[in-house]
Amino acid sequence: MTCQTYNLFVLSVIMIYYGHTASSLNLVQLQDDIDKLKADFNSSHSDVADGGPIIVEKLKNWTERNEKRIILSQIVSMYLEMLENTDKSKPHIKHISEELYTLKNNLPDGVKKVKDIMDLAKLRMNDLRIQRKAANELFSVLQKLVDPPSSKRKRSQSQRKCNC
């Protein structure tokens, strides 16, 4: 319950962060609804501050816009899961859930990306078969690191050609 109550603050941050891009969000109403949700969870309880933030800290490590969209997709999914266990008959919970679903539909599906990262972390790099496959793929991986994406390459080439 402590994690859930503190997460409500992060929910506010996410809603506000996407508020400037999603014109349909009514931030004043959402803030009021989130305040009601905080009251539902008694988030003013002293244990909420214990241990510091649990989600906002994770966002600091994700600096690029596309990276943030991946992690925010996961965070929005967590909030939707949290709200599944609440009284959906309350108008403020229903409204927050609807807005989160709208945001989720506008974010990339981060689940597959997270699964890919987890799968990579599980690879046993001391296994000879895995080492053979990895060695076989190393040059391709390095090429992806060195080569700029084709759209950036085309744009930079056209900028170099122009003698304006």
UniProtKB/Swiss-Prot annotation:
Q: According to its UniProt record, where is this protein located?
A: Secreted
Looking at the record's lineage, which domain of life comes first? Eukaryota
Q: Which organism is it from?
A: Phasianus colchicus colchicus (Black-necked pheasant)
Cross-referenced SUPFAM superfamilies, in alphabetical order? 4-helical cytokines (SSF47266)
The record's section on PANTHER family has: INTERFERON GAMMA
Kindly give the InterPro entries that the UniProt entry links to this protein.
Answer: 4_helix_cytokine-like_core (IPR009079), Interferon_gamma (IPR002069)
Keyword entries, A-Z: Antiviral defense, Cytokine, Glycoprotein, Growth regulation, Secreted, Signal
Entry protein name: Interferon gamma
- Coiled-coil spans are none
Give a short account of what the protein does: Produced by lymphocytes activated by specific antigens or mitogens. IFN-gamma, in addition to having antiviral activity, has important immunoregulatory functions. It is a potent activator of macrophages, it has antiproliferative effects on transformed cells and it can potentiate the antiviral and antitumor effects of the type I interferons.
Pfam family of the protein (one): IFN-gamma
Which BP terms in the Gene Ontology apply to this protein?
A: adaptive immune response; defense response to virus; humoral immune response; macrophage activation; response to interleukin-18
> Which residues are sugar-modified?
42, 61
For molecular function, the Gene Ontology terms on record are: cytokine activity; type II interferon receptor binding
